[in-house]
Amino acid sequence: MVKLVFARHGESEWNKANLFTGWADVDLSEKGTQQAIDAGKLIKEAGIEFDQAYTSVLKRAIKTTNLALEASDQLWVPVEKSWRLNERHYGGLTGKNKAEAAEQFGDEQVHIWRRSYDVLPPNMDRDDEHSAHTDRRYASLDDSVIPDAENLKVTLERALPFWEDKIAPALKDGKNVFVGAHGNSIRALVKHIKGLSDDEIMDVEIPNFPPLVFEFDEKLNVVSEYYLGK
């Protein structure tokens, strides 16, 4: 059986400050750095050996991937970065404190923006300091595909081609795969892998630690699902 290990990035500085992060390129906190190292230690203890790793183009996921691979003595494993594994784009909520946003817009509205499958938050202004339209890491993309806001539905739509073109073929080739990504990009892929309904995915949370493991048969049917160390 092949294994797919999802590791959400360790706690970021904005997680710690309770801010909406999205595509803002925020670093790991001290706690988050240790979580990434501990994830690698759990991987080593479990004896999981990877053939390929994938991550986003955001430093908190990249660092988590590198730290986890290093701690599991697998830093040599090839790592491919893709914007398609980025966190959900929180639009105009990016950088806002979650509690303050609830006071400004109301608890119910913020809850809908955060937890509904297909309701978009307000768009981010194109001149916002965190706008991806002026970020050179996305310079090769057509401007029309760069989001100003995303819900989970849109996040899945842009992550799914990467699953179909990269991750699934690697698994079908018998490769064990590590994916260092983000809470919502992982949730989106979990929805697809498990065939969850729009309502069912709303109750799924992906913690910063520990990593989530899926084991598949040769047809990519899920054989088992578990968190390392639990």
UniProtKB/Swiss-Prot annotation:
InterPro entries: His_Pase_superF_clade-1, His_PPase_superfam, Phosphogly_mut1. Keywords: Gluconeogenesis, Glycolysis, Isomerase. It is an enzyme of class 5 (isomerase). It catalyses: (2R)-2-phosphoglycerate = (2R)-3-phosphoglycerate. One of its GO terms (biological process) is glycolytic process. Substrate binds at residues 8-15, 21-22, 60, 87-90, 98, 114-115, 183-184. The keyword Isomerase applies. GO terms for molecular function: phosphoglycerate mutase activity. The record marks 182 as: Transition state stabilizer. Belongs to the phosphoglycerate mutase family. BPG-dependent PGAM subfamily. This is 2,3-bisphosphoglycerate-dependent phosphoglycerate mutase. It comes from Streptococcus pneumoniae serotype 4 (strain ATCC BAA-334 / TIGR4).
